[in-house]
Every structure is written in C-alpha cells, then in structure tokens.
C-alpha cells in the first residue's frame, strides 16, 4: 500500500497546504480537490533522481567530504579560468564550481557576472560581446595575483571541461539562466565527454533550469542552489529595493520560494543535492535532507574553523574560495 513517507516525505507539505486551503476556502471539498490535483500533477511531471550510488560518486568521489573550489578558487587564482582549474587541482581540491554564461553569438563560456567589468580589463554586458571580442580580454586583470597569471583568456565551456577531466576534478556547473541554451550546450559536452556523467553535477538557483536539464537528460546529476531571502536581499544582507512595498512584496516571494524549494521543487526536479548558503545549515538541516536521500553542500565556506566543522562534525562537502587560507566570501 502506498505511503506518504515513501514518496519523499510529502505528507508534511501537502498536509500544510490542505490546512491552509481549508482555512481560506472554508470548503473541505475544494481544498481536498485542489490538494489532490496538485499532488497528482507533481507525481505525473516529477523526475526520479539518478541512482544514489552514482550521485555519491559525484558528490563524494573519494568517499569523504569534498572541498570544491568556488569559481575555480577565486582567491587563489583568477576566477573561471583554466589557470584557476589547474591551481585548484594543485591545491588539493576534489572539484571546481564553474559558472556558465553565453556570448552575443551564443558561445558557452565561463563567466559569473552579466558584465565583464569586475574581472577583466574590458567593459560591457557579456550578452552584447561576441566570442572574438571577449577572447581579447584579460580575465586576470583585476585579480590580486594578476602578475602570477599572464596570458589568461576567458575559456569556453568545452575547454574548461577538458581541463577538469585532465586533472580528474569533479565539476559543479553553475547555470545562471538561459535554460534552453544552457541545457543544449551541456548536453553536447556530456555527449562528447561521457565521463561527465560520473564526475559532474548541474546546479542552479533557477528550478526551471534544473527541470529542463532533467527533461533533456535524466542521467545527469543535478542540484538546486538556495539562499534564503535571495530575492529581497543581496548576498551581504542589504535590501534590494528602496520602496517599502516592493521590498515587502519580494520578502513575501522569498517566503514562498523557500517553502517551495524545501517541500516541492526538490521532488519535482529529482535532484541529488541541495547547495545551501552556509549560515543556514545545521546538523538537523543536514539530517532532514539526508532522510530524503539528498546531500547538502555548503557555500561559501572560507575559514579553517568552518571547514573543520563541515568535515568532522557535519560530514558535508563544501564550496570554498580558497584551498590555502582564510578569506572573505565572494557573492
């Protein structure tokens, strides 16, 4: 006989939803009808996660907590470059987190920001620049160790994948948007490099990206990324909007997104991991996700004490800006 708990612990969120609908509609029939319909839709359109054994091969490839170099280790080398990938491998990282974006002519490249201003000697929006134009820029220009990394170029997705595989690094693909273009580009590299199925994971803040990736290829390991209050506040905790009403609206949206991420979207997408901002992770939090068969990966863990806590106490892998020393986080 089917049990709620066997379906990933959905009894809690659907019971809560039913109670809310009962209070709002005052109609048991309508509340039950809506809740039941939503559940059937969820079951119909959700994806099964990849087998846990293969997911663990990606998330803990050495059968222990993994340290993942954020943007290749943005404190130790220019972020999202081949030099950063090589440096991360040299410094003992188990893997690298890399940001996927696109040029004006549709070439998939590594870049975190929507503009090239912060990391290069150029200016302008990435979506307005062709690959030929961005290839002339120096991605090490504004890095603190710029003199140690001459002649760096903004790499293509394919170049980065080949470099990671050459160093036996697990890849965390952080997809910023462009669900259709991103999944198409990723599918091509998975087909060219089948080894990626066992040593990479596709991650995004945007559930539609992960859902589209699972639609495109259900064998790809995936993860949702989440930071509470991300819609209403910046990474350093500042409100995004000056208008009280607009800020309040986005706070409400944050509450809805947070509930959906923790109760519905992980199941809909069939993810294997949940990448959470470190300040909101506790032993109980890790335990609750583990009960659902999902691994928690923390970001961004940048001090020796924090790393020791994750390694020895929580047993959770983490993403860090530096493999060598304490540093302030990059948002």
Curated annotation (Swiss-Prot):
Main localization (coarse): membrane
Compartment(s) where it occurs, according to its Swiss-Prot or TrEMBL record: Cell membrane; Cytoplasmic vesicle membrane
Keywords: Cell membrane, Cytoplasmic vesicle, Glycoprotein, Hydrolase, Lipid metabolism, Magnesium, Membrane, Metal-binding, Transmembrane, Transmembrane helix
Signal peptide location: none
GO annotation (BP), single: phospholipid metabolic process
Residue intervals on the Cytoplasmic side: 1-2, 276-331
Domain GP-PDE: 65-331
UniProt GO cellular component terms: cytoplasmic vesicle membrane; plasma membrane
Taxonomy, superkingdom: Eukaryota
Gene3D superfamilies, A to Z: Phosphatidylinositol (PI) phosphodiesterase
Catalytic activity: sn-glycero-3-phospho-1D-myo-inositol + H2O = myo-inositol + sn-glycerol 3-phosphate + H(+); 1-O-(1Z-octadecenyl)-sn-glycero-3-phospho-(N-5Z,8Z,11Z,14Z-eicosatetraenoyl)-ethanolamine + H2O = 1-O-(1Z-octadecenyl)-sn-glycero-3-phosphate + N-(5Z,8Z,11Z,14Z-eicosatetraenoyl)-ethanolamine + H(+); 1-O-(1Z-octadecenyl)-sn-glycero-3-phospho-(N-9Z-octadecenoyl)-ethanolamine + H2O = 1-O-(1Z-octadecenyl)-sn-glycero-3-phosphate + N-(9Z-octadecenoyl) ethanolamine + H(+); 1-O-(1Z-octadecenyl)-sn-glycero-3-phospho-N-hexadecanoyl-ethanolamine + H2O = 1-O-(1Z-octadecenyl)-sn-glycero-3-phosphate + N-hexadecanoylethanolamine + H(+)
Transmembrane annotation, as ranges: 3-23, 255-275
Binding, Mg(2+): 97, 99, 174
Documented activity regulation: Inhibited by EDTA, calcium chloride, and zinc chloride. Enhanced by magnesium chloride. Glycerophosphodiester phosphodiesterase activity can be modulated by G-protein signaling pathways.
Molecular functions per Gene Ontology: glycerophosphodiester phosphodiesterase activity; glycerophosphoinositol glycerophosphodiesterase activity; lysophospholipase activity; metal ion binding
Subunit and interaction comment: Interacts with PRAF2. Interacts with RGS16.
Function statement: Hydrolyzes the phosphodiester bond of glycerophosphodiesters such as glycerophosphoinositol (GroPIns) and glycerophosphoethanolamine (GroPEth), to yield a glycerol phosphate and an alcohol. Hydrolyzes glycerophospho-N-acylethanolamines to N-acylethanolamines in the brain and participates in bioactive N-acylethanolamine biosynthesis such as anandamide (an endocannabinoid), N-palmitoylethanolamine (an anti-inflammatory), and N-oleoylethanolamine (an anorexic).
Family as reported in the entry's similarity comment: Belongs to the glycerophosphoryl diester phosphodiesterase family.
Name of this protein: Glycerophosphodiester phosphodiesterase 1
Organism listed in the record: Bos taurus
């Amino acid at each position: 006989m089917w049990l709620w708990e066997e379906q990933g612990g959905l009894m809690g969120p659907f019971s809560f939803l039913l109670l809310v609908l009962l209070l709002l509609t005052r109609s048991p029939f309508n509340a039950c009808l809506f809740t039941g319909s939503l559940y059937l839709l969820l079951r119909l359109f959700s994806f099964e996660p990849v087998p846990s054994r293969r997911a663990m091969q990606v998330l803990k490839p050495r059968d222990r907590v993994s340290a993942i170099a954020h943007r290749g280790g943005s404190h130790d080398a220019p972020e999202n470059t081949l030099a950063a990938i090589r440096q991360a491998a040299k410094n003992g990282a188990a893997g690298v987190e890399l940001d996927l974006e696109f040029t004006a002519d549709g070439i998939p490249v590594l870049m975190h920001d929507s503009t090239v201003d912060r990391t290069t000697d150029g200016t302008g929006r990435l979506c307005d620049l062709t690959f030929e134009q961005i290839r002339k820029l120096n991605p090490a220009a504004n890095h603190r160790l710029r003199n140690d990394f001459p002649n760096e170029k903004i790499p293509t997705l394919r170049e980065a994948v080949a470099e990671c595989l050459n160093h036996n690094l697990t890849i965390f693909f952080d997809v910023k948007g462009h669900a259709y273009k991103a999944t198409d580009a990723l599918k091509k590299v998975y087909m060219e490099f089948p080894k990626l199925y066992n040593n990479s994971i596709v991650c995004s803040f945007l559930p539609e990206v992960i859902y589209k990736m699972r639609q495109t290829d259900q064998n790809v390991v995936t993860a949702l990324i989440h930071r509470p209050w991300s819609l209403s506040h910046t990474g350093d905790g500042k409100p995004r909007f000056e208008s009280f009403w607009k800020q309040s609206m986005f706070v409400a949206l944050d509450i809805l997104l947070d509930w959906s991420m923790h109760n519905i979207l992980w199941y809909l997408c069939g993810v294997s991991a949940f990448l959470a901002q470190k300040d909101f992770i506790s032993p109980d939090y890790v335990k609750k996700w583990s009960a659902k068969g999902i691994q928690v990966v923390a970001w961004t863990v940048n001090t020796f004490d924090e790393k020791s806590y994750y390694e020895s106490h929580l047993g959770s892998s983490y993403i860090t800006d530096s493999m060598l020393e304490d540093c302030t986080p990059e948002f």
